[in-house]
């Protein structure tokens, strides 16, 4: 088995007359934390959205686990083994933390969300298993004591953790995190870093978009940098940190 989990080749994306991505190629290896950084408007979120099926690509191809990834929709991408969180938290506020995770888990069930409503014996047994798994994931991210709380009543940091738990419920091979530290205080950011390090320790591959450059440089195994839709660097943090193009485009002194 190759150690490359995701390979993007010459990805292009236009919005009207704007070339948002220009022949971007990169590789993400199994079991690593891969960071994607760059200034505002560099194309990070666009590339992220291409990988997760929100945007169709205008050129290039994506290989995932050795097979072409069609990227037809977020559902097909999730079924292939890629889960994501969003910069703007997207939870069901009127559902409990446990219920939010259970919704994510239904992607991997035989019955699906609607089948569970029928409540046959098989569906009831499966629903009980989903509930147990949801509780395990809430414990994993450290908010099992809030399982019965409505998502809207959780603290901001706990909502971030809940979104990660829901993504993990789909059993992804690749977890894509979009600005997970945004809005967090210093204590919450430390906890987030420990959680992501735990994911890597347990063998999960993580793609991280994050404006907190120090977090990225201290956490990621490798980092790619985009600028004006082009990749200008891809290497281990120490090499990227000292790259003159990167310093000029984005980092300045913030990575030191």
Give, region by region, the residue ranges found by the protein language model:
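Glycine-rich phosphate-binding loops of nucleotide-dependent enzymes
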Residues: 2-256
């Amino acid at each position: 088995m190759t150690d490359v989990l995701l390979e993007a080749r010459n990805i292009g994306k236009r919005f009207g007359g704007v070339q948002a991505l220009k022949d971007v190629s990169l590789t993400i290896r199994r079991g690593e934390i891969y960071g994607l950084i760059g200034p505002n408007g560099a194309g990070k979120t666009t590339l992220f959205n291409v990988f997760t099926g929100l945007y169709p690509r205008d050129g290039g191809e994506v290989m995932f686990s050795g097979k072409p990834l069609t990227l037809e929709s977020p559902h097909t991408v999730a079924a292939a083994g890629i889960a994501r969180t969003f910069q703007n938290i997207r939870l069901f506020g009127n559902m409990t933390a446990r219920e939010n995770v259970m919704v994510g888990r239904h992607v991997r069930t035989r019955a699906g969300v609607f089948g569970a409503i029928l409540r046959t014996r098989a569906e009831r047994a499966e629903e009980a298993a989903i509930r147990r798994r949801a509780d395990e994931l809430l414990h994993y991210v450290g908010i099992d004591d809030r399982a019965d709380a409505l998502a809207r009543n959780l603290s901001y940091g706990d909502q971030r953790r809940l979104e990660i738990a829901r993504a993990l419920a789909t059993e992804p091979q690749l977890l894509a995190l979009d600005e997970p530290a945004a809005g967090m205080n210093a204590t919450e950011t430390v906890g987030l870093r420990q959680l992501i390090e735990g994911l890597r320790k347990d063998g999960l591959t993580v793609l991280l978009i994050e404006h907190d450059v120090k977090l990225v440089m201290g956490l990621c195994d490798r980092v790619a940098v985009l600028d004006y839709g082009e990749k200008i660097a891809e290497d281990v943090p120490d090499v990227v940190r000292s790259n003159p193009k990167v310093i000029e485009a984005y980092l300045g002194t913030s990575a030191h």
